A protein has these predicted regions:
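Conserved short alpha-helical segments that host acidic/polar catalytic motifs at enzyme active sites
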Residues: 1-223, 228-286, 292, 380
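Flexible loop/turn segments at secondary-structure boundaries
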Residues: 23-25, 88-89, 119, 189-190, ...
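A conserved beta-strand->alpha-helix junction
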Residues: 66, 136, 141, 311-322, ...
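Generic beta-strand/beta-sheet core signal
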Residues: 112, 175, 183-184, 195, ...
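Amphipathic alpha-helical
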Residues: 142-153, 293, 305-323
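Phosphate/diphosphate-binding loops
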Residues: 161, 209, 216-217, 221-225, ...
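PRPP-dependent phosphoribosyltransferase catalytic core
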Residues: 163, 178-179, 196, 214-220, ...
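Short, glycine/charge-rich flexible loops or terminal/linker lids adjacent to PRPP-binding catalytic cores
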Residues: 308-353, 364, 391-397
Length: 475
């Protein structure tokens, strides 16, 4: 299984769905492959052939589990949805893989969810007390349970009834006997786009999935919107009170694929601009700019262009290190970062180096890389981060550590600099981050993005999660 280092945020999940094509499951597999960066723990596909639903869910990468020629026989039908998972709630177990499926009174109902619900404990408690039995520890099952228990007569009304009870960040792709449905939460925290593949509507977390299958981008699913796709066409309803969209800023900073388009620009362009703004704010004398791969490459290019300091690939990242090499023995574990990163000495030796990365979470990986660069003969090592310090955990679908594990939550800049071992450590300001996103400044009254990891301003109530976390910590 693919393993991200502990000094970066973990991706959430990716969703995909397509309606009305004989190759639905094949195209869904390809779409999920392009969204693999959003989750590597497992993948699943549910298809519908007009009579029956078919489901395959497996732990591991998409290419390892859905690469055989029998996929159309395993997952027949003209409509399919899929999901790649990185667990933010629920353990990494096969039963927690999505899409989740249930046979309801009105027919089959499969759901793939990207995000995280914030009031699951209270809802689950009520459901269990009223007789519900849960088969998973995923918050997505709560959606199925609420839809099943709704007293509304029509399926869409049952879904709206459910959405009015849950709180949190969610982009949903739902498959029923006759419909493919896309849903985005009222703030639009998690992404969802609508496309078209030769007349077949497509839903996906990112435009890179549309590009993979040769589909045309139509538009983003709007915040608070339900898109209903049937043989009659595409219908849009907005059951919620209209509020301004506040997408997660980390989609542009880190999570989304560099080639995905958000707000009419590629994600690569935003990340390059982050590096450009970082250089504008920090005048550091150095001989070379080196990205910490792969996440720091775009920002390092922008930093290099603005500062006129040469860009070099001074650190090489191995793409072939899995959990097998990380976990089994202390002898192998102690090599840690060296298994994933190696230093190109010719770019480093006798030079003043500026390392660039997109974020720093715990600081453990950063400190080891700084040490490696010094050991390769660097005169000075400076570390630049192309976003503000991450001081607060996320509860909306990103797997972040708690406050005690976030280096910026418990340490000031001077302390962090000493901990990572660099000559200097500098971050992009919040205003600089917004400038890179195309805004003159952050709207303090109504921020354009969900940026709580930097500011601690959570747009959706998290009191229930904090209460549960506090209780668990005291046990």
């Amino acid at each position: 299984m693919y393993c991200r280092d502990s000094d970066h945020l973990k991706e959430e999940c990716g969703v995909f769905g397509i309606f009305g094509t004989e190759e639905a499951s094949v195209l869904t597999t390809l779409g999920l492959h392009s969204l693999q960066h959003r989750g590597q723990e497992g993948a699943g596909i549910v298809s519908f052939d007009g009579n029956n639903f078919h489901s395959v869910r497996k732990q591991g990468l998409v290419g390892d589990n859905f690469n055989n020629q029998n996929i159309l026989s395993l997952l027949p039908g003209k409509t399919a949805i899929g999901h790649v998972r990185y667990s933010t709630t629920g353990e990494s177990k096969p039963e927690n893989l999505q899409p989740l499926f249930a046979n309801l009174a009105l027919g089959g109902f499969a759901c793939a969810h990207n995000g995280n619900l914030t009031n699951t404990h209270s809802i689950k408690k009520k459901l269990v007390e009223s007789g519900s039995i849960f088969q998973t520890s995923s918050d997505t099952e709560i959606i199925l349970q609420l839809v099943a228990r709704s007293h509304k007569k029509k399926l869409i009304d049952k879904l709206i009834d459910t959405l009015n009870q849950i709180k949190g960040a969610y982009s949903l792709v739902i498959l029923t006997n006759k419909k493919l449905i896309g849903v985005r939460d009222p703030f639009g925290i998690r992404p969802l786009v609508l496309g078209d593949k030769d007349g077949s509507p497509v839903l996906a977390s990112e435009t890179c999935a549309l590009d993979m299958i040769g589909a045309k981008y139509i538009r983003d699913v709007e915040n608070g919107e339900i898109v209903i796709i049937t043989e009659k066409g595409i219908e849009s309803i907005k059951p919620f009170k209209n509020i301004p969209e506040r997408p997660c800023i980390f989609e542009r900073i880190y999570f989304a694929s560099p080639d995905s388009i958000v707000g009419n620009k590629t994600v690569y362009t935003y990340r390059k601009s982050l590096g450009f703004e970082l250089a504008k704010e920090n005048n550091i004398s150095a001989d070379v700019v080196v990205p910490i791969p792969d996440s720091g490459v775009s920002a390092a290019l922008g930093f290099s262009q603005k500062s006129s300091i040469p860009f070099e690939l001074g650190i090489i990242r191995s793409h072939y290190v899995g959990r097998t090499f990380i976990e089994p023995s202390q002898t192998i574990r102690q090599f840690g970062v060296k298994l994933k990163h190696s230093v190109n000495r010719s770019c480093i030796e006798d030079k003043r180096v500026i390392l660039i990365d997109d974020s720093i979470v715990r600081g453990t990986t950063a400190s080891k890389i700084v040490k490696m660069v010094y050991e390769a003969g660097a005169k000075e090592v400076h570390l630049g981060i192309s976003c503000p310090p991450i001081k607060h955990p996320d509860f909306y679908g990103i797997d972040t550590p708690n406050y005690n594990e976030l280096i910026a939550s418990k340490s000031n800049i001077e302390e962090m600099t000493e901990l990572v071992g660099a000559k200097s450590l500098f971050f992009l300001s919040l205003d600089g981050t917004y400038k890179a996103m195309g805004y003159n400044e952050r709207n303090k009254e109504l921020p354009q993005f969900t940026d709580h990891c930097f500011t601690g301003e959570y747009p959706i109530d998290i009191s229930e999660i904090l209460k549960i976390n506090s209780y668990n910590a005291s046990r």
